[in-house]
Amino acid sequence: MKTIMLVDDSATILLSISNILAKAGYATEKAANAEEALRKLGTGLKLDLLITDLNMPGMNGIDLIKEVRKLAAYKFVPILFLTTESQQSRKLEAKAAGASGWIVKPATAHEVLNTIKLVVR
């Protein structure tokens, strides 16, 4: 079973996306912010994909990606953004930081799962 970490400051989004993923057969690990995600990753969690919000209180998603990419165990783990932003400049910034893709909220279950299938093999 593939494990996906979800990072979002919205409990509603975390619940909604984790339900979609569970129904599709994925295990999920949830974090309410970037700092919590980094703490969990520090425990050596086996991870196949990280999905993060871009705009969160404290450390934002771009800074989270930069920190994750410094961790040897997660250097090549795919990372997707799930965010309300759709500006091309932000997408380029995310790609430069190491993001593998982008999902614009609100997204349907179909959009989420198809995007995941493109980056998780």
What is each stretch, according to the model?
Residues 46-48, 73-78:
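His-Asp phosphorelay/catalytic-motif detector in bacterial-type signaling
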Residues 56:
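Receiver (REC) domain active-site loop signature in two-component systems and cognate sites
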Residues 53, 83:
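Active-site residues of response regulator receiver
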Residues 30-49:
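Acidic, metal-coordinating helix/loop segments flanking the phosphotransfer/catalytic sites
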Residues 105:
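A Lys-centered signature of the CheY-like receiver
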Residues 32-36, 60-66:
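Acidic catalytic/metal-coordinating carboxylates
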Residues 63, 86-101, 110-114:
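Alpha4 helix (beta4-alpha4-beta5 surface) of REC/receiver domains from two-component response regulators
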Residues 15-23:
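Charged docking surfaces used in two-component/phosphorelay signaling
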